[in-house]
Amino acid sequence: MAEITTIARPYAKAAFDFALEQNAIENWVEMLNFAALVSENETMQPLLSGSLASNQLAELFIGVCGEQINEQAQNLLKVMAENGRLVVLPAVAQLFVEMQHEYAKEVEAQVVSATELTSEQQQEMSASLEKRLARKVKLNCSIDASLIAGVIITAGDLVIDGSVRGKISRLSDTLQS
């Protein structure tokens, strides 16, 4: 995963800098997400790792994307095809979105809870995280009954495990050592 991220980062950074300069970040998010979906398509996968010449692969890929991508995005895809990097498009799209959030001082927090959180609980959690992270927080909530009770919050590098399952696991580890 780290290798893919290392390969994808310069492409994402170049695209983000260009999109920022052109004031077209949202448009680029849509184009990169669409291109990433195309690259993940099961019909396209063998072609990306196949023996097509880079210019043929780029033209084929751009043809499949059609009107969904503009000329500048086509140029990015051509460069990536020349370097054999179209397979990392999903990582490029993901890194681009992360750069967008970083630029906007936003962070997405994944919240997994044992039961559904009320809107009041979500608001309190969001406010608390915004204060702690000094960023605007967008919560993505999901439910996992195996937590027994409590929540697990993941926001960037921050992980807060306040679940009963996590506490039992830590207690078990302590008793076994």
UniProtKB/Swiss-Prot annotation:
Family per record: Belongs to the ATPase delta chain family.
Gene3D superfamilies linked: N-terminal domain of the delta subunit of the F1F0-ATP synthase (1.10.520.20)
Name this polypeptide is given: ATP synthase subunit delta
Gene name per UniProt: atpH
PANTHER family: ATP SYNTHASE DELTA CHAIN
Membrane topology: Peripheral membrane protein
One Pfam match: OSCP
GO cellular-component term (any): plasma membrane
InterPro entries named in the record: ATP_synth_OSCP/delta_N_sf (IPR026015), ATPase_OSCP/dsu (IPR000711)
Keywords assigned by UniProt, alphabetized: ATP synthesis, Cell inner membrane, Cell membrane, CF(1), Hydrogen ion transport, Ion transport, Membrane, Transport
Cellular location(s): Cell inner membrane
Main subcellular location: membrane
MF-aspect GO terms: proton-transporting ATP synthase activity, rotational mechanism
Function: F(1)F(0) ATP synthase produces ATP from ADP in the presence of a proton or sodium gradient. F-type ATPases consist of two structural domains, F(1) containing the extramembraneous catalytic core and F(0) containing the membrane proton channel, linked together by a central stalk and a peripheral stalk. During catalysis, ATP synthesis in the catalytic domain of F(1) is coupled via a rotary mechanism of the central stalk subunits to proton translocation.
Subunit (UniProt): F-type ATPases have 2 components, F(1) - the catalytic core - and F(0) - the membrane proton channel. F(1) has five subunits: alpha(3), beta(3), gamma(1), delta(1), epsilon(1). F(0) has three main subunits: a(1), b(2) and c(10-14). The alpha and beta chains form an alternating ring which encloses part of the gamma chain. F(1) is attached to F(0) by a central stalk formed by the gamma and epsilon chains, while a peripheral stalk is formed by the delta and b chains.
